[in-house]
């Protein structure tokens, strides 16, 4: 399954949750699923599979991943000695495109990925163009000086979509973000039952 390119608010309404990495819009004004029978769908109890699928889709869409990419991260998480769900969330939060987003350089993860792909981002002082790079404690990101004047960067820095997480130390003068410790499940900026995601993949790998 490829990355979805349709209306982002429609996705969030279907999942019943705001996904800050996907869109700055909110479902507050239209909380029911899209479609003629949206209100009835809210009242209908989801099956166990439906719940697992919904939680998995939250991760896919917030972090802008294809099914193949998320499955690959789950495989890596299962190799860890730490709880699989916690490890999966940590791997997602440590992706370069997400860190660029959480630092406040872009309004969404998708926009952050574009900045990385076009080499506007520096990692430890060097230009990079691979959004999936996994950052570690001590890594530092910034935007090239000439790219700080891009409207999307300027606008986001002036109106942050989210508060910066505690694991990312921000230097306002130099416009840099440094990872001081690894993210935890509590740092994920939307409600997620990651154990449901683990169970979804349990018999699919």
UniProtKB/Swiss-Prot annotation:
Record keyword Transcription regulation present: no
Xref: InterPro entries: Ribosomal_uS4 (IPR022801), Ribosomal_uS4_bac-type (IPR005709), Ribosomal_uS4_CS (IPR018079), Ribosomal_uS4_N (IPR001912), S4_RNA-bd (IPR002942), S4_RNA-bd_sf (IPR036986)
Domain S4 RNA-binding: 94-157
Cellular-component GO terms for this entry: small ribosomal subunit
MF term (GO), any: structural constituent of ribosome
UniProt record, GO biological process: ribosomal small subunit biogenesis; translation
UniProtKB keywords: Ribonucleoprotein, Ribosomal protein, RNA-binding, rRNA-binding
Pfam families documented for this protein: Ribosomal_S4 (PF00163), S4 (PF01479)
Superkingdom per UniProt: Bacteria
Stretches assigned to coiled coil: none
PANTHER family: 30S 40S RIBOSOMAL PROTEIN, SMALL RIBOSOMAL SUBUNIT PROTEIN US4M
Subunit structure: Part of the 30S ribosomal subunit. Contacts protein S5. The interaction surface between S4 and S5 is involved in control of translational fidelity.
Function of the molecule: One of the primary rRNA binding proteins, it binds directly to 16S rRNA where it nucleates assembly of the body of the 30S subunit.
HAMAP family: Ribosomal_uS4_B
Family designation: Belongs to the universal ribosomal protein uS4 family.
Protein name: Small ribosomal subunit protein uS4B
Organism whose genome encodes this protein: Nitrosomonas europaea (strain ATCC 19718 / CIP 103999 / KCTC 2705 / NBRC 14298)
């Amino acid at each position: 399954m490829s990355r979805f390119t349709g209306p982002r608010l429609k996705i969030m309404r279907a999942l019943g949750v705001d996904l800050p990495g996907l869109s700055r819009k909110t479902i507050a004004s239209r909380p029911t699923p899209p479609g003629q029978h949206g209100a009835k769908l809210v009242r209908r109890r989801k099956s166990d599979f439906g719940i697992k699928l919904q939680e998995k889709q939250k991760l896919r869409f917030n972090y802008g991943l294809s099914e193949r990419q998320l499955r690959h991260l789950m495989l890596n998480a299962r190799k860890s000695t730490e709880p699989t769900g916690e490890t999966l969330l940590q791997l997602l939060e440590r992706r370069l495109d997400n860190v660029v987003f959480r630092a406040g350089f872009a309004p969404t993860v998708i926009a952050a990925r574009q900045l990385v792909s076009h080499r506007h981002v520096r990692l430890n002082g060097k230009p990079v163009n691979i959004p999936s790079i996994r950052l570690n404690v001590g890594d530092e990101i910034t935007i090239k000086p000439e790219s700080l004047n891009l409207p999307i960067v300027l606008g986001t820095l002036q109106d942050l979509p989210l508060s910066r997480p505690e694991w990312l130390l921000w230097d306002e003068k130099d416009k840099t973000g440094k990872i001081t410790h690894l993210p935890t499940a509590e740092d994920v900026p939307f409600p997620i039952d990651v154990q449901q995601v683990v169970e979804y993949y349990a018999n699919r790998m």
